[in-house]
């Protein structure tokens, strides 16, 4: 997925570097809010079960795109990060039977 985003951005000459990292992080936070809004709409603010909608999928995709664009911009290997966090969660489950942090 990360390479797909990189190829798309490069082929369309989408320049992300001029945007400061903090702006990119705020954009990701904004996308999270839009995803939450689609969840609320789908559940009628918690009064019914969640139904996956096209709008929810699009907002989820926006978050993935934004995260992977940030990873490319910062030369972060997203798959390696995922492997590290899965190992962290496995270790927590093995040691304390809970994935949550102790902070």
Locate the predicted segments by residue.
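Flexible "arm" and connector segments at domain edges
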Residues: 1-60, 64-103
């Amino acid at each position: 997925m990360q390479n797909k985003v990189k190829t798309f951005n490069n082929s369309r000459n989408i320049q992300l570097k001029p945007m400061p990292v903090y702006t990119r992080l705020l954009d990701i936070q904004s996308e999270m809010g839009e995803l939450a809004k689609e969840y609320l709409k789908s559940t009628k603010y918690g009064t019914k079960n969640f139904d996956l909608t096209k709008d929810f999928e699009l907002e989820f995709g926006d978050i993935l795109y934004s995260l992977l664009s940030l990873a490319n911009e910062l030369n972060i290997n997203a798959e390696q990060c995922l492997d590290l966090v899965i190992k962290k969660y496995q270790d927590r489950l093995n040691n304390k039977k809970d994935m949550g942090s102790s902070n």
